[in-house]
């Protein structure tokens, strides 16, 4: 389990050891949150961890939550389906924000809608402490020029923060950077999935070293290259390795 600071794009909490390792993610996350200084932050968590106790813990730490909603919270999902049917979103009269990105042969348009607590959500707000904002994110993605390759996805969110549509869009977009900035780098650049070391705490210890190395290489800005190339350069060049370490006062 990892936590990541969206503003600086580096992970700051490694896999939980000891008693946490024997816990499920649902019980470990509140304990992880209690280890972090999150006051004044917006904590974004995926749908699997959209749980009332996690939301409560975040508020107790004087932070705000932004949680994705899926079928594991049936009443919330049903309320979204009822109050935000796709047929009505094209002429939505509330606050909304559009974005569009193109690159690598594909284009993606995103529509972000926010609303105050309405309808069935008023009753649900007694179960979800601090609930203030409902969010819907709709994305249209097309590969190449063929309109038949266009796909649509709809995602629902709840938040204790009072968010504008633009703020909502920025927050959920930043959340998905975790997949690219953290998991992709660990799996591809650091080859974590290929590691077969399992004995004792060795896997967790090596994962910690990978995070340290990844953070050091990410923060080294003199070489314009990806993590994989920087890693190889540091292995072959003692001078560059010293530069990487010196940037963090470790040489």
Regions found by a protein language model. Give the residues of each.
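Short, surface-exposed basic-aromatic patches at helix termini and helix-loop junctions that form
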Residues: 55-63, 85
